[in-house]
Amino acid sequence: LQSNKEIVSGLIFDPIKDEMFFAEKNKGSYLNNQRLRVSKKNVIDDCLFSSNHNGVRFSNFNMRYTGCAALDLAYVAAGRFDGFFHNDINIWDVAAGSLMVQEAGGLVNDLNKFNNNAINIRASSDGINDKMLKELENF
């Protein structure tokens, strides 16, 4: 949900696992009513990342490719993934998840909010954010 060009709430449901991820601006991120927090890892080689197929080929990170950006971001918020990056993705694919990451204590970078539909996004915990961004400078 957007209000005044700001994402104020978001919901992602995984019917396979019966998991409901929800975030509200300034009120936190939740999974089935349990508060979420991003990973506390700070050694990038110990981290697990998600991206699209181009990201998997580009990066030397430990990677998973799920094919669902919204759920990938929910997993970053839950600490299941340590980071997520994707280029040229639609805002509606990442709006809810980006709020979830932020409300779970993570950082979302390169989110060119609502200037056009295709955006670039990088999301992670504060502990690895700078290292991740440096690795992805040419992505």
Q: Where in the sequence are the language-model features?
A:
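Short, structured interface segments
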Residues: 28, 34-37
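DPxDG-like acidic metal-binding loop motif
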Residues: 1-30
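An extended, acidic
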Residues: 37-139
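Short gly/ser/thr-rich secondary-structure transition/capping motifs
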Residues: 31-32, 104
